[in-house]
């Protein structure tokens, strides 16, 4: 019986200040929710081990500060990431409109590959009534960008696990594709490179 493969993945969660990034992360990693989280300064990191597609994944998830003054510093944390959660607050239109900028920041800082960089968008706080971003609008934006969209509630534990695990699955697929491509390129010999047989 083959031992289960182990893969480390770095994921990041980004978005405007106050959209609930820390709440989402703690809901996913610790299955907890608190009303009053302190503002994240810079970045904090949480880890979670899951089993997906017969692979043990160690997810290192970076929770980044959403303040404008931290944006240049936060962008350095994008490097080497395997996937990204873009979060906004469905009761805050500005946080949704800022997704374009956050997405652009990530794509500018990650190394372009043949395989697209995995992202998911989370519309958080669907438990609240004063909604400003219609579901169809968010879905339309995501469809245009070919990014999966989830309506979530960190407070009521709605769709949080599903969203993170879809991102993990996409990040794992990309990781495998890159690894396979790298190994194929490394061992591929062109006809000119192949050793010629010689008679003694």
From Swiss-Prot:
Single GO MF descriptor: GTPase activity
Membrane topology, record value: Lipid-anchor
PTM sites of type Phosphoserine: 186
SMART domains cross-referenced by the UniProt entry: RAB, RAN, RAS, RHO
Organism domain of life: Eukaryota
Chain ranges for the short sequence motif Switch 1 as given in the UniProt record: 28-41
Subcellular location: Late endosome; Lysosome; Golgi apparatus; Golgi apparatus, trans-Golgi network
Binding residues annotated for GTP, in chain numbering: 15-22, 34-40, 63-67, 124-127, 154-155
Pfam families in UniProt: Ras
Lipid attachment residues per UniProt (S-geranylgeranyl cysteine): 199-200
Keywords linked to the UniProt accession: Cytoplasmic vesicle, Endosome, Golgi apparatus, GTP-binding, Lipoprotein, Lysosome, Membrane, Nucleotide-binding, Phosphoprotein, Prenylation, Protein transport, Transport
GO biological process, one term: positive regulation of interleukin-6 production
Main localization, broad class: other
GO CC annotation, single: phagocytic vesicle
Keyword Phosphoprotein on entry: yes
Motif range (Switch 2): 67-82
Family: Belongs to the small GTPase superfamily. Rab family.
Function of the protein: Controls vesicular trafficking from endosomes to the trans-Golgi network (TGN). Acts as a negative regulator of TLR9 signaling and can suppress TLR9-triggered TNFA, IL6, and IFNB production in macrophages by promoting TLR9 lysosomal degradation. Also negatively regulates TLR4 signaling in macrophages by promoting lysosomal degradation of TLR4. Promotes megakaryocytic differentiation by increasing NF-kappa-B-dependent IL6 production and subsequently enhancing the association of STAT3 with GATA1. Not involved in the regulation of the EGF- and EGFR degradation pathway.
Domain notes: Switch 1, switch 2 and the interswitch regions are characteristic of Rab GTPases and mediate the interactions with Rab downstream effectors. The switch regions undergo conformational changes upon nucleotide binding which drive interaction with specific sets of effector proteins, with most effectors only binding to GTP-bound Rab.
Name this polypeptide is given: Ras-related protein Rab-7b
